[in-house]
Amino acid sequence: MLRQAGIPHEVHAYTPAAPRGARSGDSRGYGLDAAAALGLDPSEVCKTLVVVADGALMLAVIPSSRTLDLKRLAAAVGAHRAAMAEPRDAERATGYLVGGISPIATTRPLRVILDVPAAALDRIYVSAGRRGLQVSLRPGDLIAAVGATVEAISVR
């Protein structure tokens, strides 16, 4: 999708570890694992989380060094309530396995919310669709490619 759209990007492969949190469904482990393996600051490597807000599935893209604030996300999208999607639902909606969920080229179109700290960086890394593969690009290019909105949805 990025190549077809003429969006400059680089793909980075690494050997994924099995982070402690990954086995329990804690998505913090995958992003931190990618950052360590690629020698990057965790604030540059984003995790893509599938969230349900008032029944609608959407993607929250936040730095791996931060935690999603579901109340902030709900307020940002005008929802009464937001919760993490069940892993099975996340995989079905995106076409990717948990730990490799990308905001790019999902199975079905999903709303994408990019966190303010990630949008402020020169370059971010997001999953390229599988564990062990990241793609780096400018936040503005990601916003343009997926129609993302930028909101303050995380805490330290």
Question: Where would I find each of the regions flagged by the language model?
Answer:
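Extended, low-hydrophobicity, polar/charged segments
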Residues: 1-156
